[in-house]
Every structure is written in C-alpha cells, then in structure tokens.
C-alpha cells in the first residue's frame, strides 16, 4: 500500500528475541520512519508578532513504500502537487511527511498577525533542505525570523526524532484550540 504524508509511520525490530522459554520477554523499541519538520518563528527587527494564523508547506510526493525488513521509506525526489496545513502551537509549526531528497527548495506559506493589525500578512518563501534532504527518522527544526517583509532561516537543527510521549505522539508541538 502506498504511503502518505501526515502519518507518523512507526517500525520496530527485535533480533534478540527468545520465544523458546515459558516466559517470553521481548523489548520493542519503535522508531519513526517518516520525517518531522518544525519551524520556530520569531520576530526580527522592527516587527512585533501577535499570532501565527496558519502555516502550509508543499510536502514530498506521496506514494512511497516502506521496506518492512529495515523500516526505511524510500525518499521521494519530487514535491506533491498539493499543499499541507501544518499543526500550530504558538509560534511553532510542525508537520510529519515522507522522506524527501531534492536540491529544489520547499515552498512554505506563513500567515501572521503582526503589529496589532487585523489582517494577516502572507509570507511565501522557499526553504532550502539541509544537504538536499529530509531523511526518515529525523526531525528538522528550523529557526524562522520574520523581518517586516522577509523571512530568513538562520539555523536548522537536525535531530534524531525520538521526542515522544508514552503513547508515541510527538511532544512538540501539539494543536491548541483558539
């Protein structure tokens, strides 16, 4: 079955299993196979951010497959024809997507209320992928700085995606009601 964006695919393996004893104990450690992308948005000079209204990206083309022996999802080399809404928590936006390998920048659209205005400002930017990829099992945390009419990305952290609660859900960010 082809895989889709927006799904946290988990995979586990245990090569040290002993099923011959009467008390079978098999520790299972799940790992994330998709990729997580996070944008931490902050104000630069000359602007006061009031609210992140919406964030959307163009994720990897869906339809990838997972190797059930290794848990690896084959990365797409192209973007989807559809955008995806990101989860928002304060000034943090997050999305789970299939792995992607391309040197083409990823489209990102942010709608932000700033400086006490009632109409959101729209920022359309292209985000370069670190080393041309978003690898499965990793979390990419971008710092996004809004400076009036532009967005810059001064830093991106590539982390092993292990930050989960007891149910396996990502710890950050979660959707908050308005």
Summary of predicted features, one role per range:
Residues 1-51, 78, 84-85, 90-93, ...:
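Short, low-hydrophobicity acidic/polar segments
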Residues 52-55, 121-131, 158:
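Composition- and surface-driven signal marking solvent-exposed, interaction-prone regions
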Residues 114-122:
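Short acidic/polar inter-strand loop motif in beta-rich domains
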Residues 141-178:
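Intrinsically disordered, low-complexity repeat and linker tracts
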């Amino acid at each position: 079955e082809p895989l889709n964006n927006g799904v946290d695919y988990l995979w586990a393996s245990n090569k040290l299993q002993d099923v011959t004893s009467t008390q079978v104990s098999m520790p299972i450690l799940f790992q994330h196979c998709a990729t997580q992308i996070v944008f931490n948005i902050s104000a630069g000079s000359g602007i006061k951010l009031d609210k992140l209204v919406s964030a959307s990206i163009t994720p990897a083309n869906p339809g990838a497959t997972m190797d059930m022996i290794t848990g690896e999802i084959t990365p797409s080399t192209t973007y989807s024809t559809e955008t995806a809404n990101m989860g928002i928590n304060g000034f943090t936006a997050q999305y789970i997507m299939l792995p992607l390998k391309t040197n083409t920048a990823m489209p990102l659209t942010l709608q932000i209320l700033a400086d006490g205005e009632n109409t959101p400002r729209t920022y359309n930017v292209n985000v370069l992928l670190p080393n041309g990829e978003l690898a499965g099992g990793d979390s990419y945390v971008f710092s996004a700085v809004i400076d009036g009419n532009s967005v810059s990305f001064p830093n991106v952290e590539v982390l092993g995606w292990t930050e989960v609660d007891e149910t396996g859900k990502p710890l950050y960010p979660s959707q908050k009601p308005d």
